[in-house]
Amino acid sequence: ALAATASALGLPSPAQAAGDAASLAKALMEAVPPHGERALGDPKAPVTMIEYASATCPHCAEFHMKVWPTIKEDYVEKGKVLFVFREFPTDQLALGAFMLARCVPQDKYFETIDMMFLQEKFWTKNPKVELFNLVGEMGLSASDAEACITKQELATNIKSVLDKANKDFGVKGTPTFFVNGTLLDGHEDPASVRKGIDAELAKLGQQ
């Protein structure tokens, strides 16, 4: 009945939608950034959540301050969700911030990203001084930070993530989330991400 209703409305059937999401999930996971993936959680988790975000995006900061901590605690740390973070710099300032995040010790990457979002309103007013201070606390010296922001290959690699996400996956703004290949609009409602994860876990019988 659902399939007939969907057909009458010109919509894909539930089976088609599930197949499309699975195909997209596979394509997304194969689109590993040239400078390496950054992920948290169990690679064998039943749900993979991919976020495309910009370091200067207020909605991204809101998500990381208000929603992400509970998702991390309730899903990622319990082995239910693999969280993949992909840089989608919407301006040169965001690009520079992400370059610096990639230059800190790898085990400090997510702590750096969290601090960038937490302090977004402050460092965007005086970017170089505040960002250099921030990454300095993560173990990156001022001289290494200076060298980092001149790495053309790193800049090109980060921008390629944005280009591919835009061209192949229809990512237009930030934050954009994919949960097992299903697109969620975190820009309008950050809390919808949690609902999307719950729906996917319920579908898999693992809630």
Question: Where in this protein do the model-derived segments appear?
Answer:
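Structural alpha/beta surface segment adjacent to cysteine/selenocysteine redox centers
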Residues: A53-T56, A61-G136
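Residue-level signal for pocket-adjacent positions within structured domains
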Residues: P34-H35, L118, V179
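Glycine-rich, flexible loop/turn motifs
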Residues: G36, G96, A145
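Extracytoplasmic thiol/disulfide redox context detector
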Residues: L2-P89, A202-Q207
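C-terminal cap of thioredoxin/glutaredoxin-like
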Residues: A18-A21, S54, L134-Q207
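A general structural motif at alpha-helix termini
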Residues: A3-A4, M116, I149, I197
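Residues at secondary-structure transition points
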Residues: L40-V47, L95, D107, N126-V129, ...
